[in-house]
A protein has these predicted regions:
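AlphaC helix of the eukaryotic protein kinase fold
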Residues: 48-73
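Protein kinase glycine-rich loop
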Residues: 17-23, 28
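Activation-segment/catalytic-loop signature of the eukaryotic protein kinase fold
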Residues: 85
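Conserved short submotifs of the Hanks-type protein kinase catalytic core
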Residues: 89-103, 107, 111
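C-terminal lobe helix-coil module of Hanks-type protein kinase domains
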Residues: 178-268
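Protein kinase catalytic-loop region centered on the HRD/HxD motif
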Residues: 124-136
């Protein structure tokens, strides 16, 4: 059941203004706080959850919470900021910044100069590397999920697919499917940093050509071929053309293994280090620790189906997505159905 306009959340701290969108198993709302500031609240979509078996539903909730916590710990100028997490009824929620500006989805209706497009791609590459270091995949990279702040050239990556596509692939529209590699449309194929590489390369393809590439599923079935972007826009440099094709290789093992490797193919490294990366500053570590403490204090007991879901908190290592730089508390997922 969706929250209605005017509904109060988190002991009256937030007021729902409208529904912003639904993607995968999540739903996002525009809300205001007590001072009238706008923010985004993201949680799981109860209507979609009802279509899952009880065991898969609990597993998805665990994954959503764990990945939400990783996103909260990802402090980076090009990653959407999570203000806080809280529990409303039976659902875990994220209160996030609301970004004033336009998405690259609006800009992709025109062909961007290569230099401008690469500037946005480097920013998104840095954002993804920061997320991957937290053990978090995005799995939904596309122009519409890259916001450019009003009056600036600063891009921000939004709408992380928390828990959804990783184990529960869903039917997507064709315009979204062109950014999805084959492993995102399968329940059995492994995902990794190379998954986001494909989507970021496809995003650059669209920004430089104004055209949508053939979908990975059509290419796999032999129904279509991937047209090299330089054949569409002759102004694209040979180096960028080759990097896009490398990032959009059909089979995961044929792609660059990490976003950093792919950015190097584009020639975007700076003295061997991508800007904005490196050793995490001390203040960021403190923020991460305080975030974990806040989560533990804020997560209250809520019973689902007679089981203490929110009490099921145990230490767990981050998944092997590159390497995690933090070790917060996570929810233990129930056994997966055979």
């Amino acid at each position: 059941m969706a929250w209605i306009i005017g509904q109060k959340l988190h002991n009256g701290q937030y007021t729902i203004e409208k529904t912003l969108g639904k993607a995968g198993f999540s739903i996002t709302y525009l809300a205001t706080d007590a001072q009238g500031n706008e923010l985004v609240i993201k949680t799981l979509n109860e209507d979609r959850l009802k279509k899952l078996t009880p065991l898969r539903r609990e597993s998805l909730k665990c994954k959503f919470v764990n990945e939400a916590r990783r996103l909260e710990g990802c402090r980076h100028p090009h990653v959407i900021q999570v203000y806080k997490t809280f529990v409303e009824g039976q659902f875990f929620c994220l209160a996030m910044e609301y970004i004033q500006g336009k998405s690259l989805g609006n800009l992709s209706q025109r062909v961007l100069p290569e230099k401008e497009a690469l500037s946005y791609i480097q920013q998104m590459g840095e954002a993804l590397i920061a997320a991957h270091q937290q053990g978090l995949l995005h799995q939904n990279v596309k122009p519409a999920n890259i916001m450019v702040r009003a009056g600036q050239y600063q891009a921000v990556l939004i709408d992380f697919d928390l828990g959804g596509k990783f184990e529960y692939p869903v039917t997507v529209g064709w315009q979204d499917e062109v950014f999805a590699p084959i492993e995102l449309q399968s329940k059995t194929r492994s995902r990794g940093t190379f998954t986001d590489v494909y989507s970021l390369a496809a995003t650059l393809y669209v920004l430089l050509t104004g055209k949508l590439p053939a979908t990975s599923s059509d290419r796999q079935k032999g129904k279509a071929d991937l047209i090299p972007p330089k054949q569409i826009n002759s102004q694209i440099s040979q180096r960028v053309n080759k990097a896009i094709l490398a990032g959009m290789k059909l089979e995961p093992e044929a792609r660059p293994k990490s976003v950093l490797d792919w950015l190097k193919l584009l020639g975007l490294q700076r003295d061997g280090v991508i800007s904005g990366l490196g050793k995490k500053p001390r203040w960021a570590m403190v923020v991460g620790i305080l975030g974990v403490v806040g989560i533990v204090a804020g997560v209250v007991s809520a019973s689902l189906g007679g089981t203490g879901f929110w009490d099921n908190i145990i230490p767990e290592s981050s998944p092997d997505v590159n390497s995690s730089t933090s070790s917060p508390l996570y929810l233990k997922s129930p056994e997966t159905e055979e």
